[in-house]
Curated annotation (Swiss-Prot):
Residues 99-108 are virion surface. It comes from Varicella-zoster virus (strain Dumas). This is Structural protein 1. The lineage of its organism: Viruses, Duplodnaviria, Heunggongvirae, Peploviricota, Herviviricetes. It is found in: Virion membrane; Host Golgi apparatus membrane. Residues 1-20 are annotated as: Disordered. It is a single-pass type II membrane protein. Belongs to the varicellovirus ORF1 protein family. The chain crosses the membrane at residues 78-98. Homodimer. Coiled coil: none annotated. GO terms for cellular component: host cell Golgi membrane; membrane; virion membrane. Keywords: Host Golgi apparatus, Host membrane, Membrane, Phosphoprotein, Signal-anchor, Transmembrane, Transmembrane helix, Virion. Residues 1-77 are intravirion. Phosphorylated.
Length: 108
């Protein structure tokens, strides 16, 4: 049974450099010594989750709840403004169309 290092790589296996891909290539040295084709094992490094916004974690549930409520209030305010702008644009467009049709009918 072959021994495994602390990184999970069997002894007698070496890591090759690969700048273009995040896949680590390991070639078994024993096969290379026996003039056989090298055995290549591909493994991916563990996924690292990167937060989109760096928000410090509150120390208590009460603070977390208050922070969530504040973020929801901000979101609701932004959505309210967007809805008002969309409504104003729609009403302006309808008024423009009605005015244009009314003036074009009078000319005929």
């Amino acid at each position: 049974m072959s021994r495994v290092s602390e990184y999970g790589v069997p002894e007698g296996v070496r890591e090759s450099d690969s700048d273009t891909d995040s896949v680590f290539m390991y070639q078994h040295t024993e096969l290379m010594q026996n003039n056989a084709s090298p055995l290549v094992v591909q493994t991916r490094p563990p996924a690292v989750l990167i937060p989109l916004v760096d928000v410090p974690r509150p120390r208590s549930r009460r603070k977390a709840s208050a922070q969530l409520k504040m973020q929801m209030d901000r979101l609701c305010n932004v959505l309210g403004v967007v809805l008002q702008m969309a409504t104003l644009a729609l009403v302006t467009y309808i008024a423009f169309v009605v005015h244009t049709r009314a003036t074009s009918c009078k000319r005929e």
